[in-house]
């Protein structure tokens, strides 16, 4: 793989990570409600889920999801239901502003697992990776090394972008002055979770 080819993938991966989705929403809500440490656990979970998708694509299971309507639909509806459930929980969250106390309500391990599930149940991610990776793989060169390069690039880029979203969320949290504002913010992010879940439910198999 040439540097130019890798750089083209780097730009593509960056644009994709910057696009707001369930991962970004999950990172921002976790950062606001549980601080940087909670956000770090969430980001680690997202990258673990993304890494699993990359491995599945590497062993050929990504093609299964891109070609099998049943597999795609099962994962799609599971993901949509989970995001909508998260949205309802966020919508109903109390308007607490003591972030130190709020951070104790969920362990970082639980936030980590939640983020893994957010990424794993997104069929569009694995289908897109299955379609994208082959476009940047040079058949005349060792494919495993190229998959590793693309996979590591994808995870590092997404981790940096999600860290940016977490930092942005902390800036937003600094503007919150009372429980009413916090509750309104929880409702806003809850609505976004449900919207993304609804959009995922409406996604069609390519």
UniProtKB/Swiss-Prot annotation:
InterPro entries: Homoserine/Threonine_efflux, LeuE-type. It comes from Salmonella typhi. NCBIfam families: 2A76, PRK10520.1. The keyword Membrane applies. Keywords: Cell membrane, Membrane, Transmembrane, Transmembrane helix, Transport. Belongs to the Rht family. The keyword Transmembrane helix applies. Conducts the efflux of homoserine and homoserine lactone. It is found in: Cell membrane. This is Homoserine/homoserine lactone efflux protein. One of its GO terms (cellular component) is plasma membrane. It is a multi-pass membrane protein. The chain crosses the membrane at residues 5-25, 45-65, 68-88, 117-137, 148-168, 182-202. The gene is rhtB. GO terms for molecular function: homoserine transmembrane transporter activity. It comes from the Bacteria.
